[in-house]
Amino acid sequence: MHIESYLTNLLSMDGIAIYYGKILTFAEANGYFHSLLQNTPWKNDEVVVFGKHIVTKRKTAWYGDSNYVYIYSNSIKQALPWTRELINLKHLVENLSNTKFNSCLLNLYHDGNEGMGWHSDDEKSIEENSTIASVSFGAERKFPFKHKQNKKIISVLLEHGSLLLMKKVTQKNWLHSLPKSKKITLPRINLTFRRMVT
């Protein structure tokens, strides 16, 4: 039986979010965290909000099977070729989730002063209703979901070396965010494996 059969859906309706918890040992997670922090060609994220061009403190990097172009908030990103580390993580996540991914967006939050507001990963360049796998390294951060209609909020704490899956119609019906917290002084790296339209 697939491991997911033993795990509980975090969402009460209109979507599926499965939290696997830690999928790596502490030593493995530390190794990936420090290597990604030092070796990734991080760039400040650039977005357009209400017509204003904003350069965020949060940094990103984008990898994929081919030279994908990803459009996010009117910002164009071009995929870099996979590294060996990311391929290893991709294979691990694919085996656990029984899903194939063709791209990965990396986010670096330097501390709790950096976060993300409410949004859905429902851009046209992402396959509709496809699974998105989120792997977290570094500081533990609260990750809330908010239903788009009834505004119900459900939260999970994303641990160092953990995996969260968001599946099917989750992006249509739920928003998610990464709230800021002054208590958090350590960096966090998040990898979101996705299926892009080809």
For the regions a protein language model found, what residue spans apply to each?
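Non-heme Fe(II) oxygenase metal-center motifs and adjacent flexible, charged/small-residue loops
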Residues: 1-198
